[in-house]
Amino acid sequence: MNAYLLAALLGVVEGLTEFLPVSSTAHLRICEALLHIDLGDGFWKMFSIVIQLGAILCLPIYFRARISEFFATFPKGKSGNHTALTHPLTLTIIAFLCTAIPAFLFTKIIGKHLESVIIMGSALLIGGIVMWIVDVMFADKGATDDMDKMSVGQAIWIGLCQVLSAVFPGTSRSMSTIAAGQLSGMTRAAALEFSFFLSIPTMVVATCYDLLKTLRHKDEAGAALGVVHMDAHAWITLAIGFIVSFIVAYFVVAWFMKWVRTRGFVPFAVYRIVVGIAVLAWALKR
């Protein structure tokens, strides 16, 4: 397949799956296996980081009005009942720290030992079952229908649950934070919005850290990666993936925010279960 067409295709996959609760990591790995992609460890790692960054950067653009509102109302919030500690911006930082510290320690200890197809398929399957149960049992029964009404305890809980996605590839950061939000008493829309906001610091920091490691020719576990030789062809490939991922992710976020207000997450849970079973069956037959 033409390299530029492949970059566009993978950009579409990343843009479609980064913010849906289906695991972008798993889908990129599936594409890598099915399409027999061999770009070299170094360039593949860099390309994955760049298209992920493209998807992430659509969030500040899409939520620019909401972000401006939060900064303008700090520290009391739009309700006027907040302190600096309970403001949505602070809660986002608290949740991020509750993820960042343990996730960094776990990935240092575990490295890439859990990045197997079996683990990924199992995480997709189990995550789908959990999401289905949570969405059915807690379908918009929560009292927290806005980020402005969140508590410190909810932020800590969601941040800690997000660690699962860092440790077990295939879990999905979106799935873990959305389900945690619903379990803590948030409505679907509120849980989804906080998941999006939390992903901004989480994924920007994680992506920058991964990029730094890649530029130093190291993977997450510290193992050596091949040296990436960047020429015009390589830069164009990265640019295509980045731009396509950004555009697709922007429209996915807009669609998902509308979808969740009238529908639930069960269709995504079913999809995860089906894909998880298929991945496990394929892995066991190899």
Swiss-Prot record:
It catalyses: di-trans,octa-cis-undecaprenyl diphosphate + H2O = di-trans,octa-cis-undecaprenyl phosphate + phosphate + H(+). GO terms for biological process: cell wall organization; peptidoglycan biosynthetic process; regulation of cell shape; response to antibiotic. It comes from the Bacteria. GO terms for cellular component: plasma membrane. Keywords: Antibiotic resistance, Cell inner membrane, Cell membrane, Cell shape, Cell wall biogenesis/degradation, Hydrolase, Membrane, Peptidoglycan synthesis, Transmembrane, Transmembrane helix. One of its GO terms (molecular function) is undecaprenyl-diphosphatase activity. Bacitracin is thought to be involved in the inhibition of peptidoglycan synthesis by sequestering undecaprenyl diphosphate, thereby reducing the pool of lipid carrier available. Belongs to the UppP family. This is Undecaprenyl-diphosphatase. It comes from Koribacter versatilis (strain Ellin345). The gene is uppP.
